[in-house]
């Protein structure tokens, strides 16, 4: 083989297996994967204007935790009901408890996020998220329960998508039908049946306030033997929520 040909072949081989080219290729694959994931989220949320989500990422994780491979004899309790069949008392209680400015903000509150950032910086890790109802829904629909800044960034992106495609009433309807309210209990109808043996549309003020008070720690609320010292706080919080319900603005 002529010397010039051998040199060209060596240069071509060196170029083909250059570490920089491999790094560039891997980075390109990562970027393409991230973009594809965002497109999937975007189109999935667009479809939810017309159809209800059959489940959420958090529901599937909880079902696996509770049931494992025993899917035939084990399940979670979740029963979808339309927005107008959910008690206005529960809607007001959840707004009063979780996100008083829900109908006005664009899905997130800058002041709450900055406050959470300062608290997290002092602790050296993500311990508080400053989450609105839309942010909570974004996390439950698609994300894990891990606490780190990359996940928080993805949560904000999904929050924007939810607010882009869905009006506030639809966001709230999906939230009320998807949020965890106890061990394997998801959504307003399942919670109303589980705790009070009634329909979600018939919840009274006190019942609604108690359910709203449970949202930050629903498993503790449900399994009182594990959280007996916390239930007093639930009762106190329920009383506070009941007094604030009259000022809650609903997305009707």
UniProtKB/Swiss-Prot annotation:
Main enzyme class: transferase
Membrane topology: Single-pass membrane protein
EC numbers for this chain: 2.4.99.28
Biochemical pathway: Cell wall biogenesis; peptidoglycan biosynthesis
Predominant cellular place of this UniProt entry's protein: membrane
GO CC term, one of those recorded: plasma membrane
Keyword NAD: no
Catalyzed chemical reaction(s): [GlcNAc-(1->4)-Mur2Ac(oyl-L-Ala-gamma-D-Glu-L-Lys-D-Ala-D-Ala)](n)-di-trans,octa-cis-undecaprenyl diphosphate + beta-D-GlcNAc-(1->4)-Mur2Ac(oyl-L-Ala-gamma-D-Glu-L-Lys-D-Ala-D-Ala)-di-trans,octa-cis-undecaprenyl diphosphate = [GlcNAc-(1->4)-Mur2Ac(oyl-L-Ala-gamma-D-Glu-L-Lys-D-Ala-D-Ala)](n+1)-di-trans,octa-cis-undecaprenyl diphosphate + di-trans,octa-cis-undecaprenyl diphosphate + H(+)
Transmembrane segments: 23-43
Molecular function via GO: pentosyltransferase activity; peptidoglycan glycosyltransferase activity
Keywords: Cell inner membrane, Cell membrane, Cell shape, Cell wall biogenesis/degradation, Glycosyltransferase, Membrane, Peptidoglycan synthesis, Transferase, Transmembrane, Transmembrane helix
GO biological process: cell wall organization; peptidoglycan biosynthetic process; regulation of cell shape
Pfam families the UniProt entry points to: Transgly (PF00912)
Compartments, as annotated in UniProt: Cell inner membrane
Superkingdom field: Bacteria
PANTHER family for this protein: BIOSYNTHETIC PEPTIDOGLYCAN TRANSGLYCOSYLASE (PTHR30400:SF0), MONOFUNCTIONAL BIOSYNTHETIC PEPTIDOGLYCAN TRANSGLYCOSYLASE (PTHR30400)
Functional summary from the UniProt entry: Peptidoglycan polymerase that catalyzes glycan chain elongation from lipid-linked precursors.
Similarity field: Belongs to the glycosyltransferase 51 family.
Protein name as it appears in the record: Biosynthetic peptidoglycan transglycosylase
Organism: Cupriavidus pinatubonensis (strain JMP 134 / LMG 1197)
Gene name, Swiss-Prot/TrEMBL: mtgA
